[in-house]
Structure formats: C-alpha cells, structure tokens
Amino acid sequence: MPEDEQRSSLRGWLSRVRASFKGAGDVVETGGRGEGAVHLSKALPRFFAAMQTRPAPVLLDLGPVIGGNVTLLGDSLGCKVYIDNIFGDPRRASHDRRETEDCSGLGVDLRHPDDSIDGVLCWDVFEHLSQAAATKLVLNLARIMKPGGIGMAIFATELAPHPQFVKYSMIDPQHLRHRLVPAAAAQPRVWTSRDVQLLLTSFVADESYLLTHQQRETLFHKPVAAGHRPRA
C-alpha cells in the first residue's frame, strides 16, 4: 500500500476507535504535575484499541516495572510484555551518563529480534537523553518494531522544577497516575513539536496531543513496505 494511502487508512482507523473506551468510571482527574496527579490520556486508549486488533501482540515498555500496568495490559490485550527500563535506578543515573554522546552506558540498544514488537510505550524517556542517545534509541525501535507497529511517546513541554523521573501508572485504558521519583540530575531538555518530528523521521507520526499539564502525547507507526506480508 502506498504510504499516503497507508497513512489515510490509519487515520481513518484512529477516528473509528475514539469511542472504544467510553466512560471514565469513578476516576477523578487532578490538575498539575505533582505526586499522584491523575490525567486523562488522549493517546493511551487509541494505543489499546490498536493492540486489540492484533492476536497476542508483543509489547515493549521502556519504563520501570509497574505491576498494575503489566496486569492491565495482559488482562485487556492478552499480550506479552517486555520491560526495558533503560535508565535503571533513576536515583543513581548520573548527569554525565545521560548527557554524554557515548550511549554505551544506556540500554538504548534494545536486544530484541528485528520486526518482533507490535507496540512500544515510551514513557519518561526522551527528556533525559542526549540527542545522540535519543536518535540511537529511535533507530533501534525502527529495527525491532513490526511494519505497522504502533508506538506511544510522552514528551514534557517544560522543564521539571526538581530533578525527577515520572512513573506512569495506568489506572485504566484512559487514565494515567503520575508517580514522582527523585533523580540524580535535573531534566536536561524539552522537545518541541519540531524536535519530535525530526526525531521520528523513521516513523509516520499519526496524532499528537498537547495536554494542559505541559505534556505532549504522540502516536506513531512504522511504515509498511510495498509488497510486505505479515509473518505468520
């Protein structure tokens, strides 16, 4: 399928799944970016809906292990989840290690087979990487994701007031709770909309949502080459 048709098809699919998870239940949203803040996600329900169209999808979570997330993903999607926490313990991740152009100390190599991952969750990742490390991570994502695979990334649009990482706990397929973890060094950068576009040149950016709590959620997919047939 030509890329323009593929992109149009995926956008049409995204519009059809907007109501896939109706009703917020008893979840109460809170404002701000403080500890325990709860926010409605625009991209997460679309990511869930995308994975529900795939039999036994394989997911990669680039954040720390959060038992509730693994349980919700497994129960909702019947999927296999790999956890690659590329920073390890953020309280020990040094500023020099994250800012250096040498990526050898980071887990950005992603030791997974080519074309093996259906979906990727990129939580509090890119804000803490140098340009070189972020680029290397994206290239490795392009290698390991299946053609048509879907990714969700969150980017902060302003610097955090204190050195911290954010753990994202999924309350349901619509809501995320923010858990703040002290970090060894301050967040070195933010990514503008233009920065994100340039970073994801290996992918097709499908939708981007600028949220009121100074975050941008982005959905992207790996292009499907002409004549490509999914593996059995």
Could you tell me what each predicted segment is?
Residues 2-51, 59, 66-111, 150-232:
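Class I (Rossmann-like) S-adenosyl-L-methionine-dependent methyltransferase catalytic domain
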Residues 120-121:
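Hydrophobic beta-strand segment of the Class I
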Residues 128, 133:
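A short His-aromatic
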Residues 135-147:
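A short glycine-rich, Lys/Arg-flanked "PGG" loop and its adjoining helix->strand segment in the class I
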